[in-house]
UniProtKB/Swiss-Prot annotation:
Location in or out of the cell: Cytoplasm
Gene that this sequence comes from: infC
UniProt-listed HAMAP family: IF_3 (MF_00080)
Family: Belongs to the IF-3 family.
Record organism: Bordetella pertussis (strain Tohama I / ATCC BAA-589 / NCTC 13251)
Name of this protein: Translation initiation factor IF-3
Presence of the UniProt keyword Cytoplasm in the record: yes
């Protein structure tokens, strides 16, 4: 088998018995790295320490990942302009933070007869956020509410910014 030492140096091709003896003398483990290679490749290492460092690396990678959440903002067909602007600002903030936004438009009572008003509100939201978001799920009616899902647009990579 081909043997790799503690510091990653090549120890060459050795017999299995010699490799086991070396690992016992050094008080480390003999770990098979590439069983399908010809000859198989083994390495002398402290396996417990290796597993610990591997777990630390995986935990660090997990902590760097951003969990995308779906934030919901509720509208009504007759939402006033001031309220509309506040809700739109919240949607902007959610999208800029990288979260998806679920825009829900709730119909009450006889408002169900005028679904086109609700559709207009959702289209207005879409048009106001066109530079920040793309529509992931087109508006659709679910019971007494119309739902649309917006996802943040991918930022263009390598685009020179205005500052310089």
């Amino acid at each position: 088998m081909r043997l790799i030492g503690l510091d990653g140096e090549q120890l060459g091709i050795v017999k299995i018995a010699d490799a086991f003896r070396l690992s016992e003398q050094s008080d480390v483990d003999l770990v098979e790295i590439a069983p399908n290679a010809d000859p198989p490749v083994c390495r002398l290492m402290d396996y417990g320490k290796f597993k610990y460092q591997e777990q630390k690396r995986q935990a660090e990678a997990r902590s760097k990942q951003k969990v995308i959440q779906v934030k919901e903002v509720k509208f009504r067909p007759a939402t006033d302009e001031g309220d509309y602007q506040v809700k739109l600002r919240n949607l902007r903030r959610f999208l800029e933070e990288g979260d998806k936004a679920k825009v829900t438009l709730r119909f009450r009572g006889r408002e169900m007869a005028h679904q086109e008003l609700g559709m207009r509100v959702l289209e207005r939201v879409r048009d106001d956020l066109i530079e920040l978001a793309q529509v992931e799920a087109m508006p659709k009616l679910e019971g007494r509410q119309m739902v649309m899902v917006l996802a943040p647009r991918k930022k263009a990579v390598g685009k020179p910014d205005a500052a310089g």
